[in-house]
Swiss-Prot record:
Monomer. It catalyses: (2R)-3-phosphoglycerate + ATP = (2R)-3-phospho-glyceroyl phosphate + ADP. This is Phosphoglycerate kinase. Mg(2+) binds at A213, A216, D217, D373. The lineage of its organism: Eukaryota, Metazoa, Ecdysozoa, Arthropoda, Hexapoda. It is found in: Cytoplasm. The gene is Pgk. It comes from the Eukaryota. Disruption phenotype: RNAi-mediated knockdown is lethal. Glial-specific RNAi-mediated knockdown is viable but eclosed adults present with locomotor defects. Neuronal-specific RNAi-mediated knockdown is viable with no defects. Conditional RNAi-mediated knockdown in adult glial cells results in reduced lifespan due to neurodegeneration. Conditional RNAi-mediated knockdown in adult neuronal cells has no effect on lifespan.
Length: 415
């Protein structure tokens, strides 16, 4: 996929209305935002547009899954209030995202206006599908999708996309239909910069650290990365499927992925063919149940895990074993924790990898943390500033690493 896209930095925005797709899909409990991280992440692009004397910045985003219905539970109103505080200037919140009233409000706003539209997913035309009032599946009428996109296009003169978290979706607000110039915002740009380092011409040694539960979910990721990396660490629930197939290990009640097990040997074959060193755990920290208060025991690959116990983290020997490839890597991509880091007794494996990645970064290694759970690990241990890049998109970063084209990126104007 081509990563070289037109950037907001290279646009002349003076006197222009900027329609910007952002990712304000923040967690909200009882009308209160519990983490404003995604709003903070969009501030740089908004401020840059304003400093370039844009007439207005019109922001559009989704929140949650209203499935094409106007569900007040998913209103962006609390986001408008938070954005006003963070920006230190007034934010005009519109109670819709398309239609004549919205078009009128965005036609000739006061210079320097920041306008936030209501949730784009209140319309089935955003995702192209949704649910009707009785919960039945509905598909959007293509003519109405065209109309929806045309109404959005009337709200700005230039289109900027800064929503990497949704870049793997070909949704209406992500495509910039009707705009001559479609540019990447600063956040999206940063994501592309780091992922192009990993996927275009990576330095050696390039290490991938992969965790997560199912091999089947990560087949494409492993396949694609085996063509690029020099070493690969496999941890998490996924490791048990590998070890049962390869070593006939007794895994007790640990996760086993029947579907994924069929492809393990093929993946190992590919690793050998490509000269990729695979690192699998040699010991585990186990629990008698999947719970924070589980009784803790240890097990090795040779001895196996007894019935009634499950592996929930990698053990001390494995932590030592994994430290060496991390220390020698020039580039690290990490997607998925090696253990159940949410439970303190089973967090040491993930913490030791995190410590290793932070130390390597300090020594000049480029470290890229895939979104989702791995990004949560960085938040948990306050290491966001101690690694090179924490991705804002779990699904989008995964699809990029799988070698897929992201529609939201492909739609942007080439640089």
């Amino acid at each position: 996929m081509a990563f070289n896209k037109l950037s907001i930095e290279n646009l002349d925005l003076a006197g222009k209305r900027v329609l910007m797709r952002v990712d304000f899909n923040v967690p909200i409990k009882e009308g209160k935002i519990t983490s404003n991280q995604r709003i903070v992440a969009a501030l740089d692009s908004i401020k840059l547009a304003l400093s370039k004397k844009a007439k207005s910045v019109v922001l559009m985003s989704h929140l949650g899954r209203p499935d094409g219905n106007k569900n007040i539970k998913y209103t962006l109103a609390p986001v408008a209030a938070e954005l006003k505080t963070l920006l230190g200037q007034d934010v005009i919140f519109l109670s819709d995202c398309v239609g004549s009233e919205v078009e009128a409000a965005c036609k000739d706003p006061a210079p320097g206006s920041v306008i936030l539209l209501e949730n784009v997913r209140f319309y089935v035309e955003e995702e192209g599908k949704g649910l009707d009032a009785s919960g039945g599946k509905v598909k959007a009428d293509p003519a109405k999708v065209k109309e929806f996109r045309a109404s959005l296009a009337k709200l700005g003169d230039v289109y900027v996309n800064d929503a990497f978290g949704t870049a793997h979706r070909a949704h209406s607000s992500m495509m910039g239909d009707g705009f001559e110039q479609r540019a990447a915002g600063l956040l999206l740009n940063k994501e592309l910069k780091y992922f192009s380092q990993a996927l275009d011409k990576p330095p050696n040694p390039f290490l991938a650290i992969l965790g997560g539960a199912k091999v089947a979910d990560k087949i494409q990721l492993i396949e694609n990365l085996l063509d690029k990396v020099n070493e690969m660490i496999i941890g998490g629930g996924m490791a048990f499927t590998f070890l049962k197939v390869l070593n006939n290990m007794k895994i007790g009640g640990s996760l086993f992925d029947e579907e994924g097990s069929k492809i393990v040997e093929k993946l190992v074959e590919k690793a050998k063919k490509n000269n990729v060193q695979l690192h699998l755990p040699v010991d585990f920290v186990c629990g008698d149940k999947f719970a924070e208060n589980a009784a803790v025991s240890e097990a090795t690959v040779e001895a196996g895990i007894p019935d009634g116990h499950m592996g929930l983290d990698v053990g001390p020997k494995t932590r030592e074993l994994f430290a060496a490839p991390i220390a020698r890597a020039k580039l690290i991509v990490w997607n998925g924790p090696p253990g159940v880091f949410e439970f303190p007794n089973f967090a040491n494996g993930t913490k030791s990898i995190m410590d290793g990645v932070v130390a390597a970064t300090k020594n000049g290694t480029v470290s890229i943390i895939g979104g989702g759970d791995t990004a949560s690990c960085c938040a948990k241990w306050n290491t966001e500033a101690l690694v090179s890049h924490v991705s804002t998109g779990g699904g989008a970063s995964l699809e990029l690493l799988e070698g897929k084209t992201l529609p939201g990126v492909a739609a942007l104007t080439s640089a």
